[in-house]
């Protein structure tokens, strides 16, 4: 006997903001009659952190041993279950053939943004289940991205230019050199994914050593907080993007201005999450030849979801969502996206909103066929400012994260690949936002 169950989200890029309505369908196909209790759709959103630390202990015999402790924490933001047909105390016969069940859920307004990190994550998913009588339950899962707006225009501090200076002298054989001065400057500290940060770096090398290389890196700093078995924090730092500058000779000064492009990344702070905190900064480093420590300056960066108006070229403000072409509907194999969503790019032949796998007892979770039209543009969440050119919703630069979500059912597929999407803008003058 072959059974199929699929989830189709009406928003093909599976990206939503708090307060949006998630709509979709559960598709079930059975070759023979099935005795079931119900078919359900369960929505959930959670934050989880977990890491393991080791420590050495000496036992009563004076022997040393290594003890491992796992620290963890959990927060739940969304838990909604609906019965699409039947119920826990019912028994119904599902006739052979194909069956489609619609679902709809309104997301709470204050959800934190989706996030994938080394020691923790924030994930949202819908699980469809067919509860069979005297048989294994059949389940399939679909992950989706949730975003929390971070409007840079509402924070006056991120609009201001910032200059940071560091200075040191080098000592060798009781002699002090002239000063080494490193200066970093940006015209603002609030940006969005897709933008280029104009970075000005100045090096005044009054020493007798060469500055072998100068770099500027965008760093992602994450603080994970666990509450079990005790409260503890774990901090990670990753270089996201790096630009380099040429060496600076002894008693030489140089100044450069370069652009550092921001890839698709989650917004700063992860508002409304109490166990994961996210910050970004520019780390400008002068590497000194010889046995000397390097010189650094750091500039905090706020990554938002809505760009500063002052950084949008006037010509691009004319590309309002209302003037963008709508997706074709006549030949599309699926119903058109909801009219309240503006359009956003959708890579052809991708299935970001549906997960699939093959189980052990003849049950298959199969992807719905995707639209074949290369110009089909799916729906995307709306922006609060109609004059801002709409972003695309790009997969996070960190790529695929293997997802294992536990389930009490014996017939659940694990190992789903999940990549959150984040709003990414093209605000360069003379170039239209990608469609």
PLM region descriptions:
Residues 1-435:
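C-terminal beta-sandwich interaction modules and adjacent acidic
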